[in-house]
Amino acid sequence: MAEKLPPEVQAQLAKFQQLKDQLDRLLLEKSTIENELREINKVLEELSVLNADATIYKIVGNLLVKSDKTSVEKELNDRKELLELRSRTYQKQESILRKQLEDLQAKINEMLSKYYPQGGQTGIKA
């Protein structure tokens, strides 16, 4: 039978798992933002080839609403700016979380080697 881990190691492992879950959620949100940014860039590229007086329709809920090119471009550029800001924020948070996970992983491995010095192979990997 496997030995039960000391409470302080269990607490650190729980913290490690929480940080890992937090990183996973952050990466999912970041991916969603990056996908939306790519879509906005494609739409802006398509709009750039249209005449200024071109008729444009945008989806609002379940409706197609007539709009002008300038206002649609402004809305898209505003949204793009907001998403880019969020993306930069998420990149910083990701970096911080990865560093915390790395530090915690080293701490847990150190604790495990203290409790199980003969094991040699005991440790966790991110």
From Swiss-Prot:
It holds the Pfam family Prefoldin_2. InterPro entries: PFD_beta-like, PfdB, Prefoldin. Keywords: Chaperone, Cytoplasm. One of its GO terms (biological process) is chaperone-mediated protein complex assembly. One of its GO terms (cellular component) is cytoplasm. It is found in: Cytoplasm. Its main location: cytoplasm. One of its GO terms (molecular function) is unfolded protein binding. Molecular chaperone capable of stabilizing a range of proteins. Seems to fulfill an ATP-independent, HSP70-like function in archaeal de novo protein folding. Heterohexamer of two alpha and four beta subunits. Belongs to the prefoldin subunit beta family. NCBIfam families: gimC_beta. This is Prefoldin subunit beta. It comes from Saccharolobus islandicus (strain L.S.2.15 / Lassen #1) (Sulfolobus islandicus).
